[in-house]
Amino acid sequence: MSDKTPRKPTAFRLEQPARVSAASEQEEPRHPRAVKDLEQITPQADVFDLTDDEAAELEILDPAFEAPERKGWSLSRILFGALGILVSFAIGIWTEDLIRALFARADWLGWTALGVAMVALAAFAAIILRELVALRRLASVQHLRKDAADAAERDDMAAARKAVDALRTIAAGIPETAKGRQLLDSLTDDIIDGRDLIRLAETEILRPLDREARTLVLNASKRVSIVTAISTRALVDIGYVIFESARLIRRLSQLYGGRPGTLGFIKLARRVIAHLAVTGTIAMGDSVIQQLVGHGLASRLSAKLGEGVVNGLMTARIGIAAMDVVRPFPFNAEKRPGIGDFIGELARLNSDRNARK
């Protein structure tokens, strides 16, 4: 035990902490005032978005369409024309000899062959007439493009009305343009400038068609990109690109009211190819596009998926060129689509496919 004397019990007063009410903790309400520093949400950067430099370089590879000058008779045209006449004579002589031989054998065989020949001739004449109408329709679209551009440049109201009336005629059978045509009819008398009338007609009538055309081009590019990514043979890739491009050209022409026949489609495809050849798109192939995109998008993808993006871009470029050729009015009020509008979607499509693997 300790030697210390135990202390006596004593009472202690404990100091109670001051109670603070919840109301006292709150600050006095502030007066209403305008908030200047609003909270801003910074969107997350997409790795597949193009930089300004990449978009500018892609636009350089995608110039606007300029109608080629009509050339006179070339040697190739004279050659094929002469061969066509000779083949027609040969078919006619062969048919005549066949009918004469059948008449010599039996009259009913001769009359049957003559009737079949007349039916074939009538069908051939109907096909030629249909093709000529389709060619005339395509030619009228090309003339309308030129007339609309001239009317907008000169601000000629009379020429603008004539061009808009021709556009109404072309779009009369297209249901997507019904609302735009109705609105244009109600506002035509209120517009006094030819340039404004051209821009209004382009906006109200061609905008829904342009939206559908972009969808067609994007879907075709996606299909080509997927087939290229999963295909193991280059011949399959080339064949599918040609097939998809031909179908895209025809569908775009039908969308804008062109409705080309066989000869019309061949002529339309030649114009698209000529446009691509002038801009150098076909010749650049893998070299320029891979140099352009290789340090950006394609470097983030595998080699095979990069080839899919390249082929998809080529298909998109063909679709854009086809839009330039078959569109009744040139792009003025509406923004012309470019390769940059499709490259992000193609890259995301291939990257998602690579991630699923």
Curated annotation (Swiss-Prot):
Q: Where is the composition biased (Basic and acidic residues)?
A: 27-36
Where does the record say this protein resides?
Answer: Cell inner membrane
Q: Is the keyword Transcription regulation in the record?
A: no
Q: How does it sit in the membrane?
A: Multi-pass membrane protein
Per the record, the major location class is membrane
What cellular component terms from Gene Ontology apply here? plasma membrane
Transmembrane spans: 78-98, 109-129
Region feature Disordered, mapped onto this chain: 1-36
Name by which UniProt lists this protein: UPF0283 membrane protein BSUIS_A1077
The family note in this entry says: Belongs to the UPF0283 family.
Record InterPro entries: DUF697 (IPR021147), UPF0283 (IPR006507)
Keywords per UniProt: Cell inner membrane, Cell membrane, Membrane, Transmembrane, Transmembrane helix
